[in-house]
Amino acid sequence: MTIALDKFTKDENDLFDIMDDWLRRDRFVFVGWSGLLLFPCAYFAVGGWFTGTTFVTSWYTHGLASSYLEGCNFLTAAVSTPANSLAHSLLLLWGPEAQGDFTRWCQLGGLWTFVALHGAFGLIGFMLRQFELARSVQLRPYNAIAFSGPIAVFVSVFLIYPLGQSGWFFAPSFGVAAIFRFILFFQGFHNWTLNPFHMMGVAGVLGAALLCAIHGATVENTLFEDGDGANTFRAFNPTQAEETYSMVTANRFWSQIFGVAFSNKRWLHFFMLFVPVTGLWMSALGVVGLALNLRAYDFVSQEIRAAEDPEFETFYTKNILLNEGIRAWMAAQDQPHENLIFPEEVLPRGNAL
């Protein structure tokens, strides 16, 4: 029997190998296969946002001014969501709504879907970039796994929540003041602050901030080798290559402070990874629940007693009244197409909430 050697060896000029060699070449800014998704999507998302906040009005979708051209500033400009009547249309430039007319596409809110979808894929591309580089330098992929937290929050808030509602209209617009208004909307219509998933998200994010502050301060406090400057600040060198802090000293310090302390760096740093990522994932799950109009905690017994007894009031019942005021004010303003009319006696009156 004859054996053909090298029969299945790859052609040296194979197109995939040529592209792989160029994409993953060592350069100042790594490109990689993930870059084919990341860079175009990030460019279009950021470019679309700058274009919208600079030039595009929200008059036709929200009845608002939202661009620098109309007199907004950085905090009040936004790329606004499409009108509620457009439901969940992708609003493609060549679609039946805009029919290839760029000006009409902008007026209809096409830039919002453009920025949201390119932004989502850009974030996914950035996570894939971390996977790819970790693989290249033989690291574990925990950076990429951690970045799944922000991606989950973005996708749940900007895509899944409006998909569960009547249209993109109910997603946040891309702007600072617009996001603040969306937060108030979430509170008034979903009582978001009393949602256990929001509580877990707050605990995760603020807990992570506390852990970062404690960890950074502890490492700086336990440096045992510094430069030879005359005082502490001159001797401290932030670019020192060697690890010269004492885990043993840090453990002793926190054992005396709290009675317990991390005994090894692996568990400490895993905990610092686990707390914020879990918090972000929990808040994302909560927003998915809101997309389905799942309710937060309801203490109905307190509401009934407060309605029957004028002298009984709790912070919960006061917040429920506040939420009713938010709904009464925001619904008529945000959804004029619904022709909502509230009797004067149910509208909030100054401090009389």
Curated annotation (Swiss-Prot):
Chain sites annotated for binding chlorophyll a ChlzD2: H118
Residues where pheophytin a binds: Q130, N143
GO CC, alphabetical: chloroplast thylakoid membrane; photosystem II
Enzyme class at the top of the EC tree: oxidoreductase
Membrane topology, as annotated: Multi-pass membrane protein
Catalysed reaction, written as an equation: 2 a plastoquinone + 4 hnu + 2 H2O = 2 a plastoquinol + O2
Residues binding Fe cation: H215, H269
Main location group: plastid
Sites bearing N-acetylthreonine, chain numbering: T2
Listed EC numbers: 1.10.3.9
Note on cofactor: The D1/D2 heterodimer binds P680, chlorophylls that are the primary electron donor of PSII, and subsequent electron acceptors. It shares a non-heme iron and each subunit binds pheophytin, quinone, additional chlorophylls, carotenoids and lipids. There is also a Cl(-1) ion associated with D1 and D2, which is required for oxygen evolution. The PSII complex binds additional chlorophylls, carotenoids and specific lipids.
Keywords: Acetylation, Chlorophyll, Chloroplast, Chromophore, Electron transport, Iron, Magnesium, Membrane, Metal-binding, Oxidoreductase, Phosphoprotein, Photosynthesis, Photosystem II, Plastid, Thylakoid, Transmembrane, Transmembrane helix, Transport
Residue positions binding chlorophyll a PD2: H198
Domain of life (superkingdom): Eukaryota
Positions with a binding annotation for a plastoquinone: H215, F262
Membrane spanning stretches: 41-61, 125-141, 153-166, 208-228, 279-295
Phosphothreonine PTM sites in chain numbering: T2
Description of how the protein assembles with itself and partners: PSII is composed of 1 copy each of membrane proteins PsbA, PsbB, PsbC, PsbD, PsbE, PsbF, PsbH, PsbI, PsbJ, PsbK, PsbL, PsbM, PsbT, PsbX, PsbY, PsbZ, Psb30/Ycf12, at least 3 peripheral proteins of the oxygen-evolving complex and a large number of cofactors. It forms dimeric complexes.
Further comment found in the protein's record: 2 of the reaction center chlorophylls (ChlD1 and ChlD2) are entirely coordinated by water.
Family classification: Belongs to the reaction center PufL/M/PsbA/D family.
Functional description taken from the UniProt entry: Photosystem II (PSII) is a light-driven water:plastoquinone oxidoreductase that uses light energy to abstract electrons from H(2)O, generating O(2) and a proton gradient subsequently used for ATP formation. It consists of a core antenna complex that captures photons, and an electron transfer chain that converts photonic excitation into a charge separation. The D1/D2 (PsbA/PsbD) reaction center heterodimer binds P680, the primary electron donor of PSII as well as several subsequent electron acceptors. D2 is needed for assembly of a stable PSII complex.
Protein name: Photosystem II D2 protein
Species per Swiss-Prot/TrEMBL record: Atropa belladonna (Belladonna)
